Amino acid sequence: MVGELRYREFRVPLGPGLHAYPDELIRQRVGHNGHPEYQIRWLILRRGDDGDSSQVDCKAEHILLWMTDDEIYANCHKMLGEDGQVIRPSQESAEAGALDKSVLGEMETDVKSLIQRALRQLEECVGAVPPAPLLHTVHVLSAYASIEPLTGVFKDRRVLDLVMHMLSSPDYQIRWSAGRMIQALSSHDAGTRTQILLSLSQQEAIEKHLDFDSRCALLALFAQATLTEHPMSFEGVQLPQVPGRLLFSLVKRYLCVTFLLDRLNGNAEDQDAQNNFIPEELNAGRGRVELEFSMAMGTLISELVQAMRWDWASSRSESSSPIFQPPPTEFFRPRAQRFRRSRRFRPRTAFASVNTYALYVRDTLRPGMRVRMLEDFEEISAGDEGQFRQSNDGMPPVQVLWDSTGHTYWVHWHMLEILGFEEDIEDVVDIDDQGAMVHGGLGVAPPFQHWKPIAQLFAEPYVVPEEEDREEREHLTQAEWWELFFFIKKLNAEERQHVVELLQEFLEGEHVLDFEILPELTVPVELAQDLMLSLPQQLDDSALRDLFNCYVYRKYGPEVLVGKRNRPFVLDDQLNLFRIETDSEAQDPPSQSASPALRQLVEGLGPSGKLLVDLERALSSEAPQENEVKPCLLQLQEEPQPFLTLMRSLDTPASNKALHLTALRILMQLVNFPEALLLPWHEAMDACMTCLRSPNTDREVLQELIFFLHRLTSTSRDYAVILNQLGARDAISKVLEKHRGKLELAQELRDMVFKCEKHAHLYRKLTTNILGGCIQMVLGQIEDHRRTHRPIQIPFFDVFLRYLCQGSSAEVKKNKYWEKVEVSSNPHRASRLTDRNAKTYWESNGTAGSHFITVHMRPGVLIRQLTLLVAGEDSSYMPAWVVVCGGDSISSVNTELNAVNVMPHASRVILLENLTRFWPIVQIRIKRCQQGGINTRIRGLEVLGPKPTFWPVFREQLCRHTRLFYMVRAQAWSQDIAEDRRSLLHLSSRLNGALRQEQNFADRFLPDEEAALALSKTCWEALVSPLVQNITSPDEDSTSSLGWLLNQYLECREAAYNPQSRAAAFSSRVRHLTHLLVHVEPCEAAPPVVAISQSKGRNRSHDWSSLTTRGLPSSIMRNLTRCWRSVVEEQVNKFLTSSWKDDDFVPRYCERYYILQKSSSELFGPRAAFLLAMRNGCADALLRLPFLRAAHVSEQFARHIDQRIQGSRMGGARGMEMLAQLQRCLESVLILSPLEIATTFEHYYQHYMADRLLSVGSSWLEGAVLEQIGPCFPGRLPQQMLQTLNISEELQRRFHVYQLQQLDQELLKLEDTEKKIQVAHEDSGKEHKSKKEDAAGETAAVAMADEEEEEGKKEEGEEEEGEGEEELEEEEERYYEGTMPEVCVLVLSPRFWPVASVCHMLNPTTCLPSYLRGTINHYSNFYSKSQSHSGLEKESPRQLQWTWQGRAEVQFGDQILHVSTVQMWLLLHLNHLKAVSVESLQALSELPPEVLNKAIGPLTSSRGPLDLQEQKNIPGGVLKIRDDSEEPRPRRGNVWLIPPQTYLKAEDEEGRNLEKRRNLLNCLVVRILKAHGDEGLHIDQLVHLVLEAWEKGPCPPRGLVSSLGRGAACRSSDVLSCILHLLGKGTLRRHDDRPQMLFYAVPITVMEPHTESLNPGSSGPNPPLTFHTLQIRSRGVPYASCTGTQTFSTFR
């Protein structure tokens, strides 16, 4: 399941401890496809600390979601009837409390008569005090209105007329009674309340008839109506102060939008019932409701953006990149920048250094001058323009009012370019400067890139981009046309008719047009561009700002046409839009006619400053004329910037007293004009509060300010509410306290502000409700867009989302929360505190304890963290004790916030965290330095604050709705798949459609990367992850849906090679699905995140794969790999069950393994996770085999490898083919490495490798094979075999040197002896001659004897060395003068080489020639001496045991016979005997018959030199040399007669003994763990105890020992293998937190041996022996017999 089923209801997880629960069916509608849809209320439930779920108020937190029948069937079981159909919402009213029909009729008659009487009485008392009967009538009507069955009577339009008359009455009691009636009417349900509000708000010019109290009454009713509809908290976000007049307008727009939305979503019956209450202009037909809703929603967004003042800091994105698909084929380019410059001022490039330029700017710049930013600095970007305000000694020192942000920001001197006053600036473009500005960060659109697939592994991306229709690119989409139509509707009738005529002319009479059918047209892009050229001259400033900010203008506006050659006039037309037309009188600078106090202000405004001059002139007389002031006011309403600049002049320093007084005088006079109340006073009211709070404000200015504010609030109490929201009450109280109450009207102003506390709360709540409701409607439109796949056609929809997402990509660690930083000394170094360079520092200069840093915070910013950066290397300059203080002004920093002791090794010192109060001034005082230092060094300062944006709130809501929508859809799709697995083939197209739709939405509406990534992550977690979980979960038959599909893919894989077959199409769909599910999984780890500067807005590339790579739930890959593993296990298990006995089992298994590996790459790509899952699946199948069957499989693997290694020796094409087969086999064998079967495989491989090395010798291939499959040998026995072989070869080299040394010593002795003999017999020549002849004869006899002996042999063996050595044989071999054979002895350890006792050479003296026996004895002496020299004499001496195993090269005529040691010994007997019986050979060698017969077989074959003759009296027959005349044989060449490899059978006694040994070890492990109980044992300790018990107890049955030889010995790898087996069976268990501890879990049935019991107290077997191997090689040329009789001579 996707979520959690509890009481048969589906719960969708929405976050940590948060989930949604389907609660109620609200309404029903017919969907876009004709099928019914149902709106379900999902409750938001939170999980408490104790794990229980507690329901939150359903009206407080819920989500309304439209669902289809299938989605309700899969998610909302309780809303289904017994027949499985959705239970429709009940249409019957409650019967409880219902009135009788007759009584109800009488009451309805009374209500109608009361309404007529109230209207008549109201008309009679116009202008007089309302009579008591009227009040009584209204009171009775209110009582009737509270009765719910009478609600229909009050829907008469006369009731609305009565309420309107009462609300517009000047008498307070009548207005109060009207409020009582409205509350009574709206007390029944939210729908009625909304209808009443809508009908009242849509009355014509209702604002003119409502005073402050009436408007507040309606606003309070609206707040009550919307409080529970869209609950949303904007805690931590600073909402602007919106006056009641603007709030009421927003309420009207909001109610109209909600009504139209209800008409779109409601039934026809409900709509007919509501029509009586709704104005006629809203009762349009269904066909135009969507258009009206889009226009109304666009109007609401437009007004809301202005009310929230979002348009102040409009940072419009210029380009976009998608998150699912590559960039679109065409995109708009950013608006061309016109670089303005004054030729009077020098640019920065004209100076030799930056410091020189900074000094020039400081000396030249004057307040009011325009400046431009040359480089990016924190939140100010290169190219931003602004007005210079002031400068001081702080850091940064320059304060500029920036146009891009709407507020002041402090920068450095060298960052500014002087543009001068407005009249000095020229529109010129310098090519060099333009390039520098673009490079500095103004930003241009990125170069166009054609789409190409993701360069990983697939031939197409997992989300295929839609192909654009060329015809569609030539016309506007309906959404784009409706956005342009929004502005056409704002034109008057004459201008509208002109647009209709233009369209008719362009379409060449194709349609007979009128204004009503314009929304249905398909408009070409060229025609739309013509319209956009003419619209700016016909729209007011507000609509013009909306036009420039809308999507269609940014995409097709005049700036896009600048580069087109066929439209050369476009640029001039565009520039004309921004040209301020002035008459001839305005050509003179307006500052010359302004008063001295306003001159600087007027100069800063440029040409628009003339409005202030005209306004001041009109108001300068004692009795200003309305006809002179009114035109100025109308102009200020259209262009309010001069008015706002005048009000914000109160925010300048207190030294500008004359300016303040002049501004207050003008503002005071403006209030007397009714038209002036339409100006945006609320937008600059914070400047008045700044002046009021400033401790340096002059008393006269304060008094004038009090007078002005009192007059303004008396004229409109809305501004008293705004002052209350700005905290004016406390500020006035402080001013009164400071001036001891000597300010006139200050007390009255404070009381008036205090009385508006309730209204201020109402305004804040209304602002929150409207904004929350708009967000919910936006989310609803996004949901409809997902469900219907229809484009969103609401104007400014992207604008609203852009403002909601503002701050999502803001860098939190930027120092954007403070205005400036001042220091106690060395102010020129203060900038080093904020340069983010740890190598620079600010150093103080003063007395100890007098150093401080003062931070001026931005208004309203709460410090989240204040950090001081220090360095221990500064020694005595490093701070030791720091005190942080806060204050409201620089003169009142006396509140201690924190005191911190700094440790000597600290680098970052956190001074403040999570403040709950705003402190305008924060001062850091360094009271003491380390080691008593005087001055201090500070490396840096970091100030972190919260993100005052709507993004966190909107992100939470967006992710909640997205998660709920897609998890519900995922559950419905999963239900379809569960009912019919074949529908899984359509899942790829479904997912592609959903992801492509989200990609297009992000590309069109989401402004930056973080917003897009948040949406993408939610989609993957809500849609892909649950689907993967469901389709990979096994059902009743233990097979998952995806597993079934993958099995089908593997079964029809061969047939899929035909592209025309159905199997090919099926396989293609399966691959599309698997590619889609795993495409975003990275092949490599993501690189570490590096803090780099990124472009703002939508210039960044949206790559969903990067997000989903980082944010992809691990459960997706885990479930997919687990499913693939189970599929592979099932496939391999079927193969093992059917083919494990076949002779070609291993080649077929390797082929199956290769197919699975290739299929894994086809389905999932070269991802290690799926390759590992495939191998684990094969391993799981092998683990399911019984022990004997698994032993047979492991023996087959070892046999196959042995055959391929031996076959590769033949070389040529056949040898290369064997190597290829060997490589494929080794790849498939690697899966045995972590399995229990690896021990059995090692046992067989060890046997075959020993026979191979001792029979044909070692090669490079042995080491290469071990290097590749080394992990498959837990005991590392094959590796140890090769290692001991190398050690033995080194001993042989030493033995050779030892022989040479012995020979040199004997030769020296021989020379000495000869010299002594020569001296002794010098006098007796005859006697000397006689002795010399005797010596020569003896030497010749030895040589002859040597010629008759065989020249060499090779033997290898193991066991104990014979203790006696005959000196005669040693002397004979030492003085042997013939060609000595080369003898190589290999000393091999019995711990690693498996040689059975039957191969031991029990009596070497009877089997070897005398001179070879001497060589062996000589080597034994050498080996004993080497042990004594190596310091091993204190240990028990290791003895040599010679064996029959080995190989030899025997010369027989011109042939070289390659034989084994036994065969060599047998051939040597035939040198002197014509025939020899097999029985005598067996008696002489004491070999078993099977060993001897194995050696005789090749010798008596067609290639062998012997014949075996059967005789009745001689058992076994007689061997003799074959006569060449009977059967000619080749006379030359090498003949291989070594017996073939003998392979073991796991079904024989060998395998059963292995099983017995494993059962014995299992029994020991279980017994030992049971003895330790719940305490358990460490795995190392358990292995030690098992080995100790094995050694102490009696040996396993003697049959086991005799058959396995020393293989019956127990090793740690054998114990670990048994532990793995028992863990897999569940007999043992271990905890996840302590995996090294093992515990006994449940009893199992263990096959215990019935021969002998394991008694730990009995004695064990003898210590293991050291086995050795002999190899003999000839040192001379092979001997060729000179006689005619052929004999055997050992060549090697």
Curated annotation (Swiss-Prot):
Name-wise, this protein is Cullin-7
Give the GO cellular component terms, alphabetically. 3M complex; centrosome; Cul7-RING ubiquitin ligase complex; cytoplasm; Golgi apparatus; perinuclear region of cytoplasm
Q: Gene3D superfamilies annotated for this entry? A: 2.30.30.30, Cullin, Chain C, Domain 2, Galactose-binding domain-like, Winged helix-like DNA-binding domain superfamily/Winged helix DNA-binding domain
Compositional bias of type Basic and acidic residues: which residue ranges?
A: 1319-1335
The primary location reported for this protein is cytoplasm
Quote the SMART domains the UniProt record gives. APC10, Cullin_Nedd8
Question: In UniProt terms, what function does this protein have?
Answer: Core component of the 3M and Cul7-RING(FBXW8) complexes, which mediate the ubiquitination and subsequent proteasomal degradation of target proteins. Core component of the 3M complex, a complex required to regulate microtubule dynamics and genome integrity. It is unclear how the 3M complex regulates microtubules, it could act by controlling the level of a microtubule stabilizer. The Cul7-RING(FBXW8) complex alone lacks ubiquitination activity and does not promote polyubiquitination and proteasomal degradation of p53/TP53.
Do the record's keywords include Ubl conjugation? yes
Cite the CPH domain residue spans from the record: 348-421
Write down the Pfam families for this protein, in alphabetical order. ANAPC10 (PF03256), ARM_CUL7_CUL9 (PF24742), Cul7 (PF11515), CUL7_CUL9_N (PF23168), Cullin (PF00888)
**Gene it is expressed from:** Cul7
Which comment does the entry carry about domains? The CPH domain is essential for interaction with p53/TP53.
A GO biological process of this protein is: positive regulation of dendrite morphogenesis
**Alphabetical UniProt keywords:** Cytoplasm, Cytoskeleton, Golgi apparatus, Isopeptide bond, Ubl conjugation, Ubl conjugation pathway
How it assembles, according to the record, is: Component of the 3M complex, composed of core components CUL7, CCDC8 and OBSL1. Component of the Cul7-RING(FBXW8) complex consisting of CUL7, RBX1, SKP1 and FBXW8. Within the Cul7-RING(FBXW8) complex interacts with FBXW8 and RBX1, but not with SKP1. Interacts with CUL1 (via the C-terminal domain); the interaction seems to be mediated by FBXW8; it is likely specific to FBXW8, but not other F-box proteins.
Here the cross-link named Glycyl lysine isopeptide (Lys-Gly) (interchain with G-Cter in NEDD8) sits at 1570
Q: Which family does it belong to?
A: Belongs to the cullin family.
**Residues covered by the DOC domain:** 791-970
Using the record for this protein, list the coiled-coil segments as residue ranges, or answer none.
none
Q: Where is the composition biased (Acidic residues)?
A: 1357-1374
Q: Which molecular-function annotation in GO is an example for this chain?
A: ubiquitin ligase complex scaffold activity
